[in-house]
Each structure stands twice: as C-alpha cells, then as structure tokens.
A protein has these predicted regions:
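All-alpha prenyltransferase/terpene-synthase fold signal
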Residues: 1-324
Length: 324
C-alpha cells in the first residue's frame, strides 16, 4: 500500500508540477521576480494536497484533466504561503535548500510570495471558462475560503509566539491546525470531506512535528527548527502542561527571546523536558488516533465507490503518514 501511495504521489505530483509550469511567467524582471517565484514550485514537495484533489475527482468519475487546474491552483497557493511562512518563522531550510528569503532577501521573497498568490488565481479563472460560471465560480470561492482560513491559522500561531503564550490546550492546537492546513475551508455541504481532511491533515502535521526532532536529510528539514522558531507544537504544549513551575518559568524566558538569541543549551533543555514528560509517546498516540479517524471517515466517503487505484490511494494515506 505504501508503494501505491508513493507512486501515486509521484505521478500526480509530476502532472501538477507540469501544469504549474504552464502558468509560471517569464520575462523582465527575471532575476528579481520571475526566477524567485518559480523556485518553490520547482522544488520537490510531497504534493499531497493536489494528489488528493486529482484522486478524489477520478474516484468520483471525473478525469484527471478536469481536476488538474484546481490541483495546480492548490499547490501554487500552498507555495505562496510557504514563502511568507518561512519569513515569519525565520526558517532557513525548505525542501533541502535555503529558504527563498535566505537566497534573495526578505523584500524580494515577500514580493515573490505575493506574485504566487496572484498566480494561483489563473488556473481558477481557466476553470470558469471550461466548466462555466456556476461550477467555476464555486471552485474559486472554495479557494478563497482556503486562503482566508489558512491565514487565520497562521495569525493564531503568530499571536501565540508574539504574546509568548504557552499555556495551551490540545483543542487550541487542533483549532489552529484545522485552519492553517486549509481543511476547514468550504462554502458547500462537504462535511464528510472536511472531517476526513481535518483528521488526516492534523495527523500529518503532528507527525511532521515529530520528524522535526530528528529529521531525515531526505526531507530537507532543519534540525529542531520548530523549537528554534518557538512553534507551539503539540509536543511543546504537552511538555509545558506537565512541567514544574520552575521549568515553566524557564520555558517562558526562553521563548520570550528572539530566535537568534536561543542556543543549543536552550534546545537541549526543551528536548530533555519533552522526553522526560512523555510528550513524544503522547503525541505519537494522538497522531495515530487521528489517522484512525481519517481512515474511518475515508471508508464512509469512498467505500461505496467502485474499486479503483485512486480509492485505494486515499485509503492508504492514513498509514503512509507514518511510513514516509
């Protein structure tokens, strides 16, 4: 099953990158706009969002050609948000290479991110021309909701960091992830799909938090980058909740400082606290429970459809999260 998922992600990801390439402009100013904005879309990401888009369309009887523009729009929007997120978080690596602002500076990276936001609209406008105004505009409205809710999720997380809020509940984290990972978005009656996406997206994010503690070089992640950035992961929330008063005070002082003022000793303290308080096991079990809920929801949505590779791909995502 993991091979099927990996192969499908590669196939649909390749198709999406090809579709995105058709929307990437060139010309003047190439060096300061068009080359930077094309950087992230050309890097090899996981491509889970566009692949789910294509597989779902095919599982319900549509063609890949019907879904490819929406898949390209989803990935272009995702890359636009990554550019801005990396600046806001002070991240140094993205997909194994320096982040855009590390390569080109913050002003040019912001401009490239803005351009990617605008570029993500072009495939959606093409949908209107191909599907007609009724369906095309519905898809466009869905994407607008995706963007708004993702921005809300980012604002929630940035607010926690700015105000140095550490005393959070699991529900606070899930609410942020629900918005930030774009799964809440819908103006239509798509509740089963929302639940599936939320469970899968939250499990994926939590597993990413775990991978960040000891990243495989293949994933291009910065070692302990989330801790250096002060991200309120479920790991940190759980460790803080079970810490002593003295440990809480130290965490508060640590995360009140700017990223560049945090050092290896600070990271070692947080890692030790996470290990001693059983946060890794707790979070791992939490992620598996969410993945199980995603699998159950997937069966209710896709189980009645004719057997197909796309249906099996969707079912296989819940276990693939932990085997990638």
């Amino acid at each position: 099953m993991s091979s099927l998922v990996a192969d499908t992600l590669e196939e649909y990801g390749s198709s999406t990158r090809e579709a995105m390439a058709g929307y990437l402009p060139n010309g003047y100013p190439a060096r300061h706009l068009y080359e930077p904005l094309a950087d992230y879309p050309r890097r090899a990401g996981k491509m889970m969002r566009p692949s789910i888009c294509i597989a779902t369309a095919r599982a319900f009887g549509a063609s890949q050609a019907d879904a490819i523009r929406s898949a390209a729009a989803i990935e272009l929007l995702h890359n636009a948000m990554l550019v801005h997120d990396d600046i806001q978080d002070g991240s140094e690596l993205r997909r194994g290479r320096p982040t855009l602002h590390m390569l080109h500076g913050v002003p040019l990276a912001i401009n490239a991110g803005d351009a990617l936001f605008l570029l993500s609209l072009r495939p959606l406008f093409d949908n209107v021309g191909i599907f007609g105004s009724l369906l095309g505009l519905r898809i466009l409205r869905e994407m607008e909701q995706v963007a708004w809710h993702s921005l809300e999720g980012q604002a929630i997380e940035l607010g926690w960091i700015r105000e140095n809020i550490l005393d959070l509940e699991d529900a606070d984290y899930l609410n942020m992830v629900l918005r930030k990972t774009c799964w809440l978005a819908t103006a239509l009656d798509l509740e089963p799909f929302i639940r599936f996406g939320f469970y899968l997206g939250a499990a994926f994010q939590i597993q990413d938090d775990l991978l960040n503690l000891a990243p495989d070089p293949r994933y291009g992640k910065e070692m302990n980058g989330d801790l250096l950035e002060g991200k309120r992961s479920l790991l940190l929330i759980h460790a803080y909740r079970h810490a002593s008063r003295a440990e809480r005070d130290r965490l508060s002082r640590l995360f009140r400082r700017q990223r560049e003022q945090r050092n290896e000793e600070d990271v070692a303290f947080v890692l030790s606290l996470i290990a001693e308080r059983g946060s890794i096991d707790y979070v791992r079990q939490f992620a598996h429970a969410l993945a199980g809920a995603a699998l159950h929801q997937s069966a209710s949505i896709y189980g009645g459809l004719p057997p197909s590779r796309d249906r099996e791909f969707i079912h296989g995502l819940a276990s693939w999260i932990f085997n990638r």
